[in-house]
Amino acid sequence: MKRPDYRTLQALDAVIRERGFERAAQKLCITQSAVSQRIKQLENMFGQPLLVRTVPPRPTEQGQKLLALLRQVELLEDEWLGDEQTGSTPLLLSLAVNADSLATWLLPALAPVLADSPIRLNLQVEDETRTQERLRRGEVVGAVSIQHQALPSCLVDKLGALDYLFVGSKPFAERYFPNGVTRSALLKAPAVAFDHLDDMHQAFLQQNFDLPPGSVPCHIVNSSEAFVQLARQGTTCCMIPHLQIEKELESGELIDLTPGLFQRRMLYWHRFAPESRMMRNVTDALLEYGHKVLRQD
């Protein structure tokens, strides 16, 4: 059985994290040549490339598996050492999460664990359609995703759903939708997307108004909180989780522009198996809180 030296795995990890050999060498306090030698040693052991030497470098499929193994070992090792050593460094917990979960339910869900356990969070924000890929690549140890199928050697549980409403301010509705939300009116109404891969707004309009992708003008803003601000100030119409704007809807500051129409995103919690005790605590906290505030039907 091939058992890699974890120094060589750490070199591979550093090249990916630091996006190059030079910075990886600085991070590890060794020469760039030593980094290359360690990775070459690892590649010789497995008889195949572990890095695609692009700029920045990226792991091959086998490289991703080894990085995932490293994440699991580091988490279990750090937890064990934490039991044996007083005053040890808090555990680093890298999770891939979508921006809307981060803006609504995720931090309250993690609050009890953060209060009771020595954890350093590293939250990597990614669209919920792509968070699972970070887990696959070994960049994180857990991910909130819309994918229901677990990766090999991973566990998955349903968290619940976020319901997205198509909302805007009353002045915005009066300006752009004086005769209601129609296909022709939507072509002139400015909207917003999180990034160029965010297709929720376009999918909603295509499904309900038969508007093809790219037909509606969209701002690009990488912030869930900014979506709410843009809608409140009458700049755009937006797809926003109901959970995020309950107060604004109740006060009338925002209105549901298409009552009865919404987009539902079911969310799942993915993590490596077996779980460490700390990850079990995180899982329990996320599931307990998620089942309270997210839609379960």
From Swiss-Prot:
It comes from the Bacteria. Keywords: DNA-binding, Transcription, Transcription regulation. One of its GO terms (molecular function) is DNA binding. It holds the Pfam family HTH_1. Residues 21-40 bind DNA. The gene is argP. The keyword Transferase does not apply. HAMAP family: HTH_type_ArgP. It comes from Citrobacter koseri (strain ATCC BAA-895 / CDC 4225-83 / SGSC4696). Residues 4-60 form the HTH lysR-type domain. Homodimer. PANTHER family: HTH-TYPE TRANSCRIPTIONAL REGULATOR ARGP, TRANSCRIPTIONAL REGULATOR. Controls the transcription of genes involved in arginine and lysine metabolism. Belongs to the LysR transcriptional regulatory family. The keyword Electron transport does not apply. This is HTH-type transcriptional regulator ArgP.
